[in-house]
Swiss-Prot record:
One of its GO terms (biological process) is DNA repair. Keywords: DNA damage, DNA repair, DNA-binding, Metal-binding, Nucleus, Repeat, Ubl conjugation pathway, WD repeat, Zinc, Zinc-finger. Its main location: nucleus. Belongs to the WD repeat DDB2/WDR76 family. Residues 1-87, 517-584 are annotated as: Disordered. Component of the UV-DDB complex, which is composed of DDB1 and DDB2. It holds the Pfam family WD40. This is DNA damage-binding protein 2.
Amino acid sequence: MGPTTRARFVHNRRRRRRRGPYAAPDDDDEEEDQQEASSSSSSSDEGEEDAEEEGSGEVDDDDGEAAEPSGKEEEVSPVAAAARSGRKASITISLKKVCKVCKSTGHEAGFKGAVYIDCPRKPCFLCKMPGGHTTLTCPHRVAMEHGVIPASRRNTNTSLDYVFQSQVKGKIPMVKPQFLIPNQLECGNIKFHQRRVTCLEFHPTKNNVLLSGDKKGLLGVWDYVKLHEKITYDSVHSCILNSMKFDTTNDGLLYTASSDGTISSTDLDTGIGSSLLNLNPNGWNGPSTWRMIYGMDFNSDKGLLLVADSFGFLHLLDRRLKARIGDPILIHKKGSKVTSLHCNPAQPEVLLSSGNDHYARIWDTRKLEPNSAFVSLAHGRVVNSGYFSPQSGNKILTTCQDNRIRVWDYIFGNLESPSREIVHSHDFNRHLTPFKAEWDPKDHTETVAVIGRYISENYNGIALHPIDFIDTSTGKLLAEVMDPDITTISPVNKLHPRDDILASGSSRSIFIWKPKTESDATEERNREKAKEFVYGSGSRKKSNGKHENSSDDDSDGSCDGKKKKKAKKTRFTHTIKGKGKSKV
């Protein structure tokens, strides 16, 4: 290990010591380093970094206290001797090959450049199935539609099918329109957030406005056409902002859910926010009582906010009364986290919930009781998300940690098993926001979904992590969107509800993609193509509506408010081969 790696290792340890032996590590920079170095480190073991530090010979302050008595004279290691004498001990790092997957010596597994090398004692990292193949030669990597049963035309054998054909399919065009892939990077806001981006949402009426949340609880509003018009609200939540929904009757009112256990409503015009629900009124009393909120959706018919916590309970909020209705209802295994909620767009009383108890469940919110789910959809591992199709609500799309995207074509049919399972790389580690496959809200055929990819690909010597557009009816990969200027992973992706635009969140940055036209393709062949980026956040608002000057220093997340710092505009140019440079 070279001196650069050793210096970073020592710096991380020193920073942890200053904050105290029991403080959680500040992984702001560690997250971005993890993403940028994902092509050179294994992703299978989440705790390898700490394990390597302990095995390197460095001992924490508490480790030297417990030692069993022995009849023989105790041998004192150089590290312990140096600690007792107050001197700094040298760090010894072993160069022996150790597999981070099976912990055995003699071989290694993980990313080598842009190629993932499998552990010979484990199944394929992509499909999780034994079969003598590796991730590089996995048939699902060669062709994503491998083993997928395409959707077939339904036979109208029952009266319910006749109703479905006439009322629903009659509104869907028989000829599938050409889908425009937003595959050209239009602009980006570099390091807009101080922590990694966790959620994105387009404004329901202002086409050019994008809202984003991050791990620190900060809410950002950005006009990506005017580039420099952006506002951040830094006092809405105190930690991870997991979900946000607009009020259907007031497009200036936004509801947000956070891991601090609160639901807040923010007036985007005035910047004034108010708390609707607080599941931790007594503050932090340990992880056994601390409740976090991940899933949230809005029932527009009844004006209800549906909120699910990390203990498996569902809470109903009346937005008009700003009060909780009834008692919490257990909808998933007690003590398990509910990861997402989604109301059916055609029948809002039908609710789809997903959890880390390996199930997605369908409920009738008019008759909510424990163990009263219509059906429980079993999965192999944690279910990151579940969504009804955006037009008819008759399909279900789920994303599971077993590297499977599951599709149910008809919610009134047999739901014992999915209509198809699509193998896709989205099994992530602790430094990433969970991947979630989402429908394209503009697609009337209800077949197109978008999701980021974890395993990197080698594009002209650069390790890139594409954003995949998938045909859920066949499992076919429609397009993989990437740019040589973006080498980090993009787990958060949102398609515009009206325009052919894709927004992606990668680390602390946000990017906007648009379809590449024929004129753009001709222009790119003749000359270099320029893209505009904006660095740093601009105006910042507190929850009381007052503006505050922002700082672009993300080391401590503080802002001095003394001098307004303008966002820096950078123009990136790159050739067809992907070798880029920046001009300020």
